[in-house]
Amino acid sequence: MRARVVIVAAVLAATAITGCQRPPAPGPQAGSLTGAPILNTVTAQAVVRDMGAAGLPVANPRDVAKQKCPDIKCIEAIETDTVTVLVFSTTGAAEGYAGATPGTFQAMNIVLQFGPTVTLADKTAYEQVVNKALL
């Protein structure tokens, strides 16, 4: 009987304590995410522009996001005659794509896909442009 009284008292105390708490305020709470965190503000277009400014070949840039992104889950895609710049919403998504696609370079959420004629020296130069943009 005494154990039953102790249990009932504990349940009542717990109910009283939790009942005295304020309900959460409406809207987003501190520490909660309302969407994917923004990794950086670097766009595919800005990367292509920086590549051109560095003297690298980026002829015929065209937005191919509508064609490529639904299948590979990117958020931006600019293709040139030599390199394609893909931007993903997360680093994990970029890593997944780059890991499954030979001949790519990945830094954070950006992936470069090189054309067959791009030399090793030019690949390194393209990669340096991306790394600089992400600083």
Predicted segment positions?
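Short, solvent-exposed recognition patches
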Residues: 38-102
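Residue-level detector of alpha-helix boundary/anchor positions
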Residues: 12-13, 81
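Low-complexity, Pro/Thr/Ser/Glu-rich flexible segments characteristic
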Residues: 26-45, 49, 132-135
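N-terminal export and membrane-targeting signals
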Residues: 1-11
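Compositionally biased, intrinsically disordered/low-complexity regions enriched for serine, proline
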Residues: 20-23, 34, 54, 58
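Bacterial lipoprotein signal-peptidase II cleavage site
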Residues: 6-7, 16-29
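Extracytosolic low-complexity repeat regions of secreted or lipid-anchored proteins
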Residues: 81-135
